[in-house]
């Protein structure tokens, strides 16, 4: 019983040679976590898809004087399409993400709902993801607050336990 877990690291931004690349630091952190948890780590590069389906839209909207939110498009177009498809190709039945959100099953439907930690709730960033794409998703942080998540990481001796929260837009770091 239980799950056969695989780690999957997604890279959405391709830095120019010589530019600082936080995704490499993030990949090393993910690799360290997977080593501690004794699970394999796969790496997927979605930078082309991200450029075409998220960043071009961001630039276009910005040129029109609007303030787009690339995280919403990244979730809709990359995390819950490209990432999901890739996960299934390598044998996944479900994906689990670190989003602070909850999924509720009712009357043969799956609904997005707010997480327990309202300060970290990410449902706004997920509101454009289609219901059918949530059918194969698990949000294990839905009933936890940030302090509980940090404590679990500390207890497991994960290198990311004290890592600063990400507050940037999706493609930066």
Regions inferred by a protein language model and the residue ranges of each:
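Internal nucleotide-binding/catalytic subdomain
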Residues: 129-173
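ATP-dependent adenylation/nucleotidyltransferase module used to activate substrates
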Residues: 1-128, 147-149
């Amino acid at each position: 019983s239980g799950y056969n877990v695989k780690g999957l690291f997604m890279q959405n931004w391709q830095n120019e040679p010589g530019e600082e690349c936080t995704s490499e630091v993030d990949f090393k952190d993910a690799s360290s976590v997977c080593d501690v948890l004794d699970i394999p780590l796969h790496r997927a590069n979605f930078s082309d898809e991200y450029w075409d389906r998220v960043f071009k839209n961001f630039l276009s909207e910005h040129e029109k004087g609007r303030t787009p939110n690339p995280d919403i498009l990244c979730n809709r177009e990359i995390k819950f399409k490209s990432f999901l498809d890739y996960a299934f190709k390598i044998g996944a039945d479900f994906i689990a993400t670190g989003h602070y959100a909850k999924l509720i099953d009712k009357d043969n439907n799956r609904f997005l709902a707010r997480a327990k930690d309202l300060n970290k709730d990410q449902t706004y960033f997920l509101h454009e993801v289609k219901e059918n794409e949530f059918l194969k998703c698990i949000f294990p942080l839905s009933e936890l607050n940030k302090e509980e998540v940090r404590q679990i990481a500390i207890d497991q001796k994960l290198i990311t336990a004290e890592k600063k929260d990400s507050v940037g837009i999706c493609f930066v770091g």
